[in-house]
Amino acid sequence: MIEDDNPEIRQQCEKLGEYFSSIGERSLAESLFIRAENAQRAVEIHIQSGDWIRAHQVAQEHMKSDEANQVLAKHAESLQQNGELRHAESLYVAIGDHDAAIAMYRKAGNRSDMVRLVAQHRPDLLQTTHQHLARELDAAGKAREAEEHFLGQF
């Protein structure tokens, strides 16, 4: 019988996990990292490969909820800083932080994606969002764009 709490076994599982991750065997690497009690690394291999759904599943299954959300939010922020807004959005939405995704697009000046997310996740705020954007654009002298939002609120 193999004892799970043996540090040498956990260390070997870590090494094997890194090896299998490096050759693209994410499923096996994930199992080894979980066995080594390193759920965060298991989540990271899925994030690195762009498998946001699996990263979220592993985090939810093997980490405390707040810890999982914190790890995924940290990666979303990193993706956002690197300009990978769609990937960051996927992570924010996966952890239920729709407002962070909306704010990210607002900060980036990407109004169409911001409005899309408001419509999907905060429909009660859609009209208010259009009004605010219309006033903001009108004040900036962008009458044509403002008009689209004035019309979008009806």
Specify the residue positions occupied by each region the protein language model found.
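Extended alpha-helical assembly domains of large eukaryotic scaffold proteins
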Residues: M1-F154
